[in-house]
């Protein structure tokens, strides 16, 4: 297991993630993109229910990618949202990203840290459409020379095996 970081470093990384979440909630997508490393991998797979006996044996059921995006692909998603023609976001969703249980560890790569957080993403749209996305995120963040941060990897793991929302146009 990798070493945990100092309280100060944990706080700084947590604050970076809180700021990033507020940019998404405020629809400041270009500012959010600026927080991403050029090499970002932004992924989410389907969640499959596995039998207890299979999990004990380490057998993982097959899954499918929901997201497997690069920065270019995320930029295209945001450009589409900015056109006002993305039907899934008309009217725009109101979101709230809640992040908790933040655990930060060092990695073998200098200035790159592994972060695990639990999250709840609340999404409201129109008058009555409400969706909750709950799960765990596995992020990697990079500290830059000027002491700024960039998101290098995000792997989103949903607790739900069935997604009941009309679409997945929100960003996690």
Swiss-Prot record:
Q: Which reaction does it catalyse?
A: 3-phenylpropanoate + NADH + O2 + H(+) = 3-(cis-5,6-dihydroxycyclohexa-1,3-dien-1-yl)propanoate + NAD(+); (E)-cinnamate + NADH + O2 + H(+) = (2E)-3-(cis-5,6-dihydroxycyclohexa-1,3-dien-1-yl)prop-2-enoate + NAD(+)
Q: In which pathway does it act?
A: Aromatic compound metabolism; 3-phenylpropanoate degradation
Kindly indicate whether the keyword Nucleotide-binding belongs to this entry: no
A GO BP entry: 3-phenylpropionate catabolic process
What molecular function terms (GO) are annotated for this protein? 3-phenylpropionate dioxygenase activity
Gene3D superfamilies the record matches: 3.10.450.50
Q: What is its EC number?
A: 1.14.12.19
Provide an example Pfam family for this protein.
Ring_hydroxyl_B
As given in the record, the signal peptide range reads none
Q: Keyword set for this entry?
A: Aromatic hydrocarbons catabolism, Dioxygenase, NAD, Oxidoreductase
UniProt keyword Oxidoreductase present? yes
Coiled-coil annotation reads none
Q: What does this protein do?
A: Part of the multicomponent 3-phenylpropionate dioxygenase. Converts 3-phenylpropionic acid (PP) and cinnamic acid (CI) into 3-phenylpropionate-dihydrodiol (PP-dihydrodiol) and cinnamic acid-dihydrodiol (CI-dihydrodiol), respectively.
Q: How does it assemble?
A: This dioxygenase system consists of four proteins: the two subunits of the hydroxylase component (HcaE and HcaF), a ferredoxin (HcaC) and a ferredoxin reductase (HcaD).
In which family does this protein belong, per the annotation? Belongs to the bacterial ring-hydroxylating dioxygenase beta subunit family.
What's the name of the protein? 3-phenylpropionate/cinnamic acid dioxygenase subunit beta
- Source organism per UniProt: Escherichia coli O17:K52:H18 (strain UMN026 / ExPEC)
Protein's gene:
hcaF
